[in-house]
């Protein structure tokens, strides 16, 4: 149910409480590339149809694992959207670090970005470790594993040979498993972490945890029932899978860890100092599932807030306009836009009709034009594939967008204005390479693309990472304008200032890149974006209208992560 969160790859890990001699207690499967989720589901479903033939005794013992290897007691799943690194199976979560005991074995998955991976790597070196690879995922795995090892040694020292309990062998291993404190482990491991994250982890003996960054940048939700505990990045997914009421699913408080012991004991506790919340807004605009009622209401309102600007841009041409949306995730905001625009136009018509009646100038032939619905809504663009091009890998995105859209013909009279609501216009690749070209075949006079998100001007290194500034269409538009106005020297000035800042206080950063945008007002940049989105073969005029940051903040005041 969360396949919307990533399509580069998928993985599942499971803990098996009962296992035969020499058999693995942790099982893992990962797949990458096209069809990865279907392939993964086939792997983990292996043998499930034979489970019904087992006796109760066999179900309670290790026999079920030989029949169905992924039938376990604790499971961890992940869908990969790779912001950095590769897209192979080796990069898919969960990652696994095997220890010589179950309590030292860790499986980890997460939605996250660490902004200081290099500093964290240096910290591991100071611990005397020799980590292999410098990816932020590997570094986090190594750091948690290190302090998990420390925790094991502390308990062994307190309970092992020579202590008052003087335990050894299996008795000592069991006591270590009982006493492991994952809150304490994560308190130590998370020192110096800087980023946004939601991590889930499994230990080989069956303990599990879920931890969230202190600013709440990445979302996390928990459903607790008498017989199980479940957690996910999205509330709507939990509600659908377990048929649970929305009010039964609670947010994992930012800065908290949910610890689930093998015994079933549950603890939620802070593990890192609290910070002012900055929940990511782009999660709500684009990434999350739209069937969450709160997200549905927010997306409707984002569309509604754009209606006055859209009608102002259309002017007298509103009767010649057709409203639609692209991609599918923009449908709810488009509905909000159409509703609000219809309401405003009807109010204008009612005022005009009242004035005509009051002044005695009303004529019968005017009434039809004033009372008939004015805002026309059609589904014009259709995706041939259920793929989200924004989260496709760079290598495949261009080929993908060329063929992913088609249009409904004979709905739009030639010379019309198309109002296309998009949830966000970030790189502009899909619009330029596919959507504008295919909509142009309908012979409109102009296409007005309306973005429910503001201009994306900066990398969001803490949230949904869009890590290469030079690919943003807003940045390319600003650079194009600087070049046109003979101000290209500003780019070098900003680069020098940014490089100097690398050696300064990291806790007092200055956004020097804002000077590039500050040379022009938002409307001028939007006009240049429209130019960049227009392919050479297009015959229609292309225009762009963006949501304001103020209206975005008013729509979702509890989500203050606006880096736009």
Segments the model singles out, each with a brief description of its role:
Residues 1-253, 259-322, 326-327:
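Conserved short alpha-helical segments that host acidic/polar catalytic motifs at enzyme active sites
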Residues 323, 330-337, 341, 377, ...:
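Extended, hydrophobic alpha-helical segments in both membrane/secreted and soluble proteins
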Residues 201, 212, 233-235, 262, ...:
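Active-site proximal loops enriched in glycine and acidic residues that flank catalytic Cys/His/Asp
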Residues 192-195, 298-319, 332, 337-340, ...:
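Phosphate/ATP-binding catalytic cores across multiple sugar-kinase/actin-like superfamilies
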